[in-house]
């Protein structure tokens, strides 16, 4: 299979569609905690409105699917600042697919597009201190730890830090060129 920006070796990134509300409605608590999105239950109508609002924004939101069309997770970009060339992203991988390289593939597809096609020069992301697998992944990908925001999220009955990671286009090309 040919590898393109949106089709990797093991998965494809596709746009979110209104019928995807069932995906957002079924996210497990661990994913929602990692995205700082643990909320009271929402009605199907509220979820549909939220998905439709997301479709109108400039940021990119993708659903990651395997070749057999199973949904692996999602990745979305935010704070896309063309003037300064910076952006951020959130990532979620569903429980049965964690630890199998899907997060790495999703991140690299988005970084490749933003750095090499849209000419952004820096990506920033924050990983919560309780998410050790994500911390290890970002370090392994060559992200630099740029700081730590103390006690920025309350979940599971405690406050946790946010670890700030960044990578420049030059670092990406050096590590993943």
Swiss-Prot record:
Gene3D superfamilies, sorted: 3.40.630.30
GO molecular function, one term: acyltransferase activity, transferring groups other than amino-acyl groups
Entry's transmembrane regions: none
Coiled coil regions in record: none
Enzyme Commission number(s): 2.3.1.-
Domain N-acetyltransferase: 11-170
Keyword Zinc part of the UniProt annotation: no
CDD domains with a match to the protein in the record: NAT_SF (cd04301)
Keyword list, A-Z: Acyltransferase, Transferase
Pfam assignment, any one: Acetyltransf_3
UniProt family annotation: Belongs to the acetyltransferase family.
Protein name (Swiss-Prot/TrEMBL): SPbeta prophage-derived uncharacterized N-acetyltransferase YokL
Record gene name: yokL
């Amino acid at each position: 299979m040919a590898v393109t920006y949106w089709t990797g070796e093991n998965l494809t990134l596709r746009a979110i569609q209104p019928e995807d509300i069932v995906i957002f409605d079924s996210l497990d608590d661990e994913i929602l905690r990692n995205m700082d999105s643990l909320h009271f239950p929402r009605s199907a109508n509220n979820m549909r409105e939220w998905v439709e609002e997301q479709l109108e924004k400039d940021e990119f939101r993708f659903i990651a699917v395997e070749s057999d069309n199973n949904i692996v997770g999602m990745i979305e970009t935010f704070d896309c600042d063309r003037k300064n060339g910076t952006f951020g992203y959130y990532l979620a991988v569903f429980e049965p697919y964690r630890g199998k390289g899907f997060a790495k593939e999703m991140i690299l597809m988005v970084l490749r597009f933003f750095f090499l096609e849209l000419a952004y020069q820096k990506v920033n992301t924050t990983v919560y201190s309780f998410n050790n697998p994500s911390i290890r992944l970002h370090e392994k990908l060559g992200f630099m730890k740029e700081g730590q925001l103390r006690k920025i999220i309350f979940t599971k009955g405690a406050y946790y830090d946010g670890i700030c990671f960044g990578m420049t286009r030059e670092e990406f090309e050096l590590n993943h060129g």
